[in-house]
């Protein structure tokens, strides 16, 4: 398992050897024995330099959250999945997980260049390290897909998930809006399939930041009018 790498050390090593490092396995990827991990593009690399390079890559048996945001999301989603299992049936816990996922996704949604590759450059702006990285849509899908599937028949879950996505659509960078809208479309399809012939279909279509029982959403102009009337 590629657990972590020394970003600053890798850039310094590559600059010192006038090289470009291309990682074939990202942080969080399982690395099978004998699998190439990194390509070194340089005119000449001494053997001692290779040993130093390997010392900047942490391989182990478990993923870690320090450089692997997807694993942090995975842990939260697993908690929600267990809560939504037939044996537990605890949609409130799943809704609380969505609260924390919302916070994480809002932070990611304001982060530029979540486009599949991380480029680390030296002080002169020369690209020195290229690493596979998650796209925003990958992380969003990881955060919501399984909860949507396992919580498809829970009004509390689908309402909280709708609120999460609608809020996120307003907060993310323009280049990520399409990914959020795609997840909203998937949620619509899920609700139609799960609640199409049920009496609670209308409730399932309402966004609620608390899942069930939350206050209605108000816009600033509505608040001003209400204040003036009082």
Regions found by a protein language model. Give the residues of each.
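Short basic (Lys/Arg) and small-residue
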Residues: 1-19, 26, 35-37, 41-230
């Amino acid at each position: 398992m590629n657990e972590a790498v020394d970003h600053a050390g890798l850039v310094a090593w590559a600059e010192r050897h006038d090289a470009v490092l291309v990682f074939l396995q990202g942080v969080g990827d399982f690395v099978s024995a004998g699998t190439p991990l990194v390509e070194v593009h340089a005119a000449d690399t001494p053997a001692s330099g290779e040993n130093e390079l390997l010392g900047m890559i942490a391989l182990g048996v478990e993923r870690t959250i320090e450089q692997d945001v997807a694993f942090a999301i995975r842990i939260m989603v697993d908690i929600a999945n267990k809560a939504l299992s037939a044996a537990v049936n605890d949609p409130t816990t799943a809704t609380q997980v969505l609260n924390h996922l919302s916070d994480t996704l809002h932070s990611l949604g304001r982060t530029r260049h979540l486009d599949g590759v991380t480029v680390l450059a030296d002080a002169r702006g020369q690209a020195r390290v290229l690493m596979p990285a998650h796209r925003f849509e990958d992380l969003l899908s990881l955060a919501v897909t399984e909860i949507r599937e396992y919580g498809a028949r829970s009004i509390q879950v689908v309402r909280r998930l709708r609120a999460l996505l609608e809020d996120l659509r307003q907060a993310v960078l323009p280049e990520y809006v399409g990914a959020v809208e795609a997840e909203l479309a998937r949620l619509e399809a899920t609700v139609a399939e799960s609640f199409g012939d049920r009496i609670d279909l209308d409730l399932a279509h309402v966004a609620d930041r608390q899942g069930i029982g939350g206050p209605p959403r108000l816009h600033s102009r509505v608040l001003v009018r209400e204040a003036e009337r009082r």
